[in-house]
């Protein structure tokens, strides 16, 4: 992990608009800005067939996958809709299939004009089923301040046993 990027300790299955989403938070610890930041999430899950175990890889489409600049923090949101590989899944299935979500973040350090690529992952036991992040900002002296100690803060919310299957129906 790149020590200049901070990541939330847990990724969350969180309410989003009228449905649910998979979310994680990251923050820029640098004194310089990260520009043209781009994020990709990949879900890896194990399946068993007659040949044995195999790993399946799925792209998780983000609500917003790039920002022109990352001055403070960014909450990455994958809406769980009918096209999501997480549609209809339960937490027990995530555990059984040893789910892991891998984040790849690319950007350019504005101060040094040097490309930054960093990876971070969340295993099933680092995911919280039914929670939402608590705001990590406060307004001080007329400007927004990020409190890195609050980057991972979340509160539990009631969640369905399974994520919606995309038809607005719980599977």
Region spans (language model):
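Canonical alpha-helical transmembrane segment with a positive-inside/aromatic-interface signature
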Residues: 1-56
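Generic structural motif
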Residues: 10-15, 29, 44-46, 106-110, ...
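Short, surface-exposed linear segments at secondary-structure transitions and domain or protein termini
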Residues: 45-48, 61-73, 122-136
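Noncatalytic linker/hinge segments flanking ATPase motor cores
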Residues: 48-51, 64-69, 81-85, 141-150
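Extended, solvent-exposed segments with strong compositional bias
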Residues: 55-95, 107-114
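Extracellular Ig-like/FN3 beta-sandwich strand-entry sites
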Residues: 96-100
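Acidic, serine/threonine- and proline-rich intrinsically disordered appendage/tail regions
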Residues: 111-171
């Amino acid at each position: 992990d790149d020590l200049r990027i901070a990541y939330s300790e847990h990724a969350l299955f969180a309410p989003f608009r009228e449905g649910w989403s998979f979310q994680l938070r990251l923050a820029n610890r640098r004194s310089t800005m990260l520009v043209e930041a781009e994020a990709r999430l990949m879900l890896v899950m194990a399946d068993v067939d007659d040949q044995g175990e195999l790993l399946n890889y799925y792209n998780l489409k983000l609500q917003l996958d790039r920002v022109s600049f990352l001055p403070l923090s960014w909450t990455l949101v994958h809406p769980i809709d009918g096209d999501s590989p997480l549609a209809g899944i339960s937490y027990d299935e995530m555990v059984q299939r040893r789910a892991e979500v891998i984040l790849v973040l690319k950007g350019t350090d504005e101060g040094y004009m040097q490309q930054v690529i960093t990876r971070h992952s969340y295993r099933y036991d680092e995911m919280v089923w039914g929670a939402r992040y608590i705001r990590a900002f406060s307004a001080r002296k007329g400007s927004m301040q990020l409190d890195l100690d609050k980057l991972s803060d979340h509160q539990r919310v009631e969640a369905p046993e399974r994520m919606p299957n995309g038809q607005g129906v719980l599977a």
